Amino acid sequence: QNLAAVISTRTNIARMNEILDHPIQQGSDRLSNQGYDIVFDHVGFAYNTGETVLKDVSFTAKQGEVTALVGPSGGGKTTVSRLAARFWDINRGKITVGGMDVSRIDPETLLSLYSIVFQDVTLFDNTILENIRIGNKDATDEQVIAAAKLANVDEFAEKLPDGWHTNIGENGCELSGGERQRISIARAFLKNAPIILLDEATASLDVENETLIQTALSRLIADKTVLVIAHRMRTVAGADKIVVLSDGTVAEEGSPKDLEEKNGVYAHMVKLQTESQNWKLS
């Protein structure tokens, strides 16, 4: 037990040192009024380990549209979504939001433009109400509950012993995966940012939870700039544009219809997933 504690402590120290080694990101707290298009212009990126993830990525995610990132595992989908919000600084090329280079925008100011709904939801040992209020710390209880209802949180919250004031445990351990994700979506409703970064998070859910979350997401993304990491092709059939990432580059981009007709990488992925879904024991 003591050895495990020592190993855990050393690992945490190593992670902290890695964070401290990163230069402090700075930038202006002023934003342009040119909308919220996200543009990747010949972007290249490598982690500190030297591993090159993106080689030459260019595409535009337009305001009011859903842009879906698809591709094989390790193709760069998750990295692209995080670079859009300047989780890290790129090695070459340029990323702009509303015409402004993200490397010149103060990180806190930039993040104010984003609502982020990823698979790994971070929750705290507090009530449902306070976990949602993280989306907007100045929101009233009424505003928090209104956002929660848009995300279908009320479907389970009002059945709990203390309702909205129920403590959900460390990282939401008292809740199911679907319930945790609905809280994450409620935060995004409460923040009401113009850009949504979304990691499709319904693959491991039961049918009821998946339906509730998809309904909530449809409400959330209306009229926003939406960049979604897609794992299942059927969920992006309604996207305005699909960007296929493979081996750190854009292999294809276009509407779902155009890419299906092109019969390239995307069409092949659709075919494979359709065959997988239709498979059954015989």
Predicted feature locations:
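ABC-type nucleotide-binding domain
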Residues: 26-282
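Cytosolic ends of transmembrane helices, especially the final helix of ABC transmembrane type-1 domains
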Residues: 1-19
